[in-house]
Amino acid sequence: MDVTKKNKRDGTEVTERIVTETVTTRLTSLPPKGGTSNGYAKTASLGGGSRLEKQSLTHGSSGYINSTGSTRGHASTSSYRRAHSPASTLPNSPGSTFERKTHVTRHAYEGSSSGNSSPEYPRKEFASSSTRGRSQTRESEIRVRLQSASPSTRWTELDDVKRLLKGSRSASVSPTRNSSNTLPIPKKGTVETKIVTASSQSVSGTYDATILDANLPSHVWSSTLPAGSSMGTYHNNMTTQSSSLLNTNAYSAGSVFGVPNNMASCSPTLHPGLSTSSSVFGMQNNLAPSLTTLSHGTTTTSTAYGVKKNMPQSPAAVNTGVSTSAACTTSVQSDDLLHKDCKFLILEKDNTPAKKEMELLIMTKDSGKVFTASPASIAATSFSEDTLKKEKQAAYNADSGLKAEANGDLKTVSTKGKTTTADIHSYGSSGGGGSGGGGGVGGAGGGPWGPAPAWCPCGSCCSWWKWLLGLLLTWLLLLGLLFGLIALAEEVRKLKARVDELERIRRSILPYGDSMDRIEKDRLQGMAPAAGADLDKIGLHSDSQEELWMFVRKKLMMEQENGNLRGSPGPKGDMGSPGPKGDRGFPGTPGIPGPLGHPGPQGPKGQKGSVGDPGMEGPMGQRGREGPMGPRGEAGPPGSGEKGERGAAGEPGPHGPPGVPGSVGPKGSSGSPGPQGPPGPVGLQGLRGEVGLPGVKGDKGPMGPPGPKGDQGEKGPRGLTGEPGMRGLPGAVGEPGAKGAMGPAGPDGHQGPRGEQGLTGMPGIRGPPGPSGDPGKPGLTGPQGPQGLPGTPGRPGIKGEPGAPGKIVTSEGSSMLTVPGPPGPPGAMGPPGPPGAPGPAGPAGLPGHQEVLNLQGPPGPPGPRGPPGPSIPGPPGPRGPPGEGLPGPPGPPGSFLSNSETFLSGPPGPPGPPGPKGDQGPPGPRGHQGEQGLPGFSTSGSSSFGLNLQGPPGPPGPQGPKGDKGDPGVPGALGIPSGPSEGGSSSTMYVSGPPGPPGPPGPPGSISSSGQEIQQYISEYMQSDSIRSYLSGVQGPPGPPGPPGPVTTITGETFDYSELASHVVSYLRTSGYGVSLFSSSISSEDILAVLQRDDVRQYLRQYLMGPRGPPGPPGASGDGSLLSLDYAELSSRILSYMSSSGISIGLPGPPGPPGLPGTSYEELLSLLRGSEFRGIVGPPGPPGPPGIPGNVWSSISVEDLSSYLHTAGLSFIPGPPGPPGPPGPRGPPGVSGALATYAAENSDSFRSELISYLTSPDVRSFIVGPPGPPGPQGPPGDSRLLSTDASHSRGSSSSSHSSSVRRGSSYSSSMSTGGGGAGSLGAGGAFGEAAGDRGPYGTDIGPGGGYGAAAEGGMYAGNGGLLGADFAGDLDYNELAVRVSESMQRQGLLQGMAYTVQGPPGQPGPQGPPGISKVFSAYSNVTADLMDFFQTYGAIQGPPGQKGEMGTPGPKGDRGPAGPPGHPGPPGPRGHKGEKGDKGDQVYAGRRRRRSIAVKP
């Protein structure tokens, strides 16, 4: 029956199973559970029947008890003998692995249990059928098996052993970890597979390899495991480890198969000795180490194969008894364990003369010996069998011991001379059984000396002289101790005598002291004189103490009189004594314990980090081979060099030339690398250009082979560069083409934004006349965005979806490809894009939406705003021609992006999608416009961030239908040049530009439509769920803050509407957007008046108030705030105001959407991460709350919206802050592709640009103002407009910020102004203070409203706290109007249209910035500020929100890390994808490592 005991060892529960012979358990498949497990079972008593043999203990050696553990018999047999039962049997042994079947796994193999359990060695059985009989025959069989198992007959051959040790898996790793002696046994032996019957169980031990019965095989840990550890179970090694493993046995002998060895050494402790033994099979080895306990053993040594080696090295001392034996003898108990199981064959060449003791085959494991796992308890010293039994306990477990002893002596017979069978008789068998010793020695069977005492653990292998020697040594040791004690006692005695003497002296002196005291006392009392006289007379002549004291007293008195006695202070000196303590310093040496470091292994986890580096490794490159990577490859130029070898691929490059159309030229220069790169690079681009066909070539061998280099290959892309790219554009869906168009535009746009815009602006101005002249130019412009947006219900937006092609961006910047996705939505707008003409207005679009209405007709003229218009041009699509022209400008922005913002790519992107659609293409152009608007226009490069926001306008896309005119989209194709934005290949990101959505505005293109129409359209559009979702979505995030409403201003100041209005007006004027045209008719007063209208004000308040709540937290819900504002309403109001003023703003706004595509948040993040601002990125994360707005992001990023609004001029209301803020984040994305590369390649330049952008009044104002709101405060939810702004900002900011930050701090950085805005608002304002003091933002901002002050204190900074100071008050509609006007002007957002309304959305923008704003609190040194801020606060993260935010971006963030792989940095654009790839690679590498690791274990 099985009895199972459960012990807890080391906290683990071990179950020992004692199997009654009845059952055998098959460990077979698993490593034993038993105690080994822990190692120490300390106790383990096995209980077992009989005897119990607790063995146990064994240190917990886990010997496990084993003890008989075995089973059944345990009882009977007396344990140890039982031992053969294997109790020892390593119970733990790996039983595991080995069949051990029995064993029950439990420690003990149970050893024999099973029939074998008989005291004899059933073990011998090895395969043991159930038979216990360990007949010699069986031994012979086993030997035969072992031999047959090995290739050579002697598997013990040294070579085999070496081989095993070397690589072998051969088990046991350990390869003899221990002493060298043990050799591992070849694994093969093990196979045998013979199945041992379960019954054989005992066998189990049989490790003998042979057996190992099939089950084992399964385990057979054997090798494999690394030593010791290896399974825990695995003894082996055990070795010290042993401990665990428990020793044991661990080795369990064996590693299987032999080799457990090593064990030995096992810690001694572990007593194991064990270890040793192990040797497995044959190796007797070990054995001994037994070592008693102590260390002992260890030794173990055991030689392997038959080498007896072993001898116990163990210190004999200990336990001596135990140790020894080495020989088979059980010797060490633990040994025996192994033996038992292992039955070591000595193998040593089978031929070896039996004489070697080792030789004892001990074939059976049992050897009876010891079974005891014995580990030794120390004590163990040998015990006689009986003694053992008794001793066992005494030994406490030590007993382990020997117990095995015997087993009756193993007597070993020399069989084959080499093996001896040891019959073990029961204990009773009389210790000698004669066998023991004789067998032991020389295996001569009798051995001249006769058997060793039955109780001798290694009785069969020890000679009498060995025992004698052991005893002698022991006695010597004892004598040494005795003498030492005697000497000590003598010393103590002397010390005592000395002490007594001192005590006596002290006592004798005390009396004198007393006497003296009395005398002095008397003298002092006047008695002294007489005494003095006496002393004088007496002098010292008298010997009496009294006289002496008198003399002394007199002397003292004199001294005292003389004041000489004053020495008293001296006492302090005593303190010095402590000094000695200093010596203790030495203890410091204990540091040595450091070794515990072993736990270090866990360190591997750290490896994961290292894995990151691997990501960089070529493997990733391979992925690069993948088509996708190839595209990224473009950035690869450097890589291309290598690929250049692939000259062949270069051929594809030729194809590229067509694509080159111009842009190729630039890359052509890169071409030089191209030659090399051409093959690969070209191939890559080819893919893009061809849209697959070329790509194919790219994929061709060149890329594949280079795969690893793939990264470089990416650089190769330059080679592809224009050529393939061009082609790809056309070939590809054309999307690439679209981007291409953008690209060209990008360059123009770049300039355009600045100069052109100005010019355009003029035209824009004309726009006003346009109304008059509507028939004339205005008409054209009109077509563009302004009306378009309203015009197109946005249904076209659906078409816009094609905009998605924006992805084409890929062609431009593979990295950005992803970004395109977002544009996709705008893409829908794309179809409308043709009408793109309105596109120009697009920029203003988002914000414009509301304003757009006003701008409507007039906007046409704003169209001129060409610069932005350019982006808008796409929308103007109708104009087709103009659209193209415009797109050109956008291109510039693209380039601009390349320089500072990824924006560049964005514009191209939009065209790209349109390109394919052709019709839509036009929208694409518009998309550009939109982007431009973002880049804006006022922001020009910086606006680029804004572009993203444009995405929101996407909704207008519906109008897009008119967009069909989109033909201009073709110009978009020019985008290809965007290549120029190389640095900003990210521009591809912009491909998002596809946002075609803006295109929709195109429909409105009919500038003719009156401002009313536009207004209505915008209003509808704005109000429409689609647009709202965009606007709100983006801005929304900030919205949440709304709740805090209380804060009137971010700064906490009341919002000054006058300030705002003036701001708006000035903005409109500064923007030079048709504002001036209209501005004549519009004045800040006008806007103010409009804003102040109760209905307007109420409207603003209702939305803004809530938002107002600085509560940045609400920011999370930011969407809500944004949503809360009815931009349509606001825009309609403002527009109506404007229109009433005679201001008609184009609908340019719509184009804005393209911007959205801009960079993806991830891209932005990547870019930022790569940039010095990377700190910013992380921090932004905090705005977790904004995450909510994130939804909006899905289609449009807050940044996108913000930028869109920004470009549209929408931002003004929110106060400049809003729009910009969001854009900021987006911007980075825009930049991400280009920026990332750009930043990487031109970090300084980029930084300068970024800073300049951020510092630009427009951006700053946007960035700065809004951020304030985010400030925590605001809970009160005042309904100040500003508060709205603030809350909105805050929400927005928060959201935006988080977004932006999340999106990319880079933008955020710029936005940081936004944060700054908060600061400005927060001059004293909640945000500034609350945030300032409180939050990282606050901190930055905190001082002086931080941002606000630094930023001129105004949301717009220019106003210097306009928002800050002004916002504090209730919304001052005048202020608001002014601000809106100014903002719009400044941004040029209103150029096309004055969507003041959008302004509100803008607010959210600011929030985005906050994260960064701090950093930029002073534009003068944004970088420094950012650095300081981050260093000081890590602040950006500081915002608790961060985690939330970060979480969302986080994933992408991870890629960011991949960014490092970014090394390809230049390839950066590709880098993004590459990063992903890298990541994969990393993982891959990680896996490899893991795999390796797995193997090692």
Swiss-Prot record:
The intracellular/endo domain is disulfide-linked. Residues 1483-1497 are annotated as: Nonhelical region (NC1). InterPro entries: Collagen (IPR008160), Collagen_superfamily (IPR050149). Detected in skin. In the cornea, it is detected in the epithelial basement membrane, the epithelial cells, and at a lower level in stromal cells (at protein level). Stratified squamous epithelia. Found in hemidesmosomes. Expressed in cornea, oral mucosa, esophagus, intestine, kidney collecting ducts, ureter, bladder, urethra and thymus but is absent in lung, blood vessels, skeletal muscle and nerves. Gene3D superfamilies: 6-Phosphogluconate Dehydrogenase, domain 3. Residues 489-1497 are extracellular. This is Collagen alpha-1(XVII) chain. It is a single-pass type II membrane protein. Residues 1-154, 167-186, 562-1011, 1209-1234, 1261-1316, 1434-1497 are annotated as: Disordered. The lineage of its organism: Eukaryota, Metazoa, Chordata, Craniata, Vertebrata. GO terms for cellular component: basement membrane; cell-cell junction; collagen trimer; collagen-containing extracellular matrix; endoplasmic reticulum lumen; extracellular region; extracellular space; hemidesmosome. May play a role in the integrity of hemidesmosome and the attachment of basal keratinocytes to the underlying basement membrane. The 120 kDa linear IgA disease antigen is an anchoring filament component involved in dermal-epidermal cohesion. Is the target of linear IgA bullous dermatosis autoantibodies. Residues 567-1482 are annotated as: Triple-helical region. Residues 1486-1497 have a biased composition (Basic residues). Residues 1-566 are annotated as: Nonhelical region (NC16). Keywords: Basement membrane, Cell junction, Collagen, Disease variant, Disulfide bond, Epidermolysis bullosa, Extracellular matrix, Glycoprotein, Hydroxylation, Membrane, Phosphoprotein, Repeat, Secreted, Signal-anchor, Transmembrane, Transmembrane helix. Residues 1-467 are cytoplasmic. It comes from Homo sapiens. Residues 145-230 are annotated as: Necessary for interaction with DST and for the recruitment of DST to hemidesmosome.
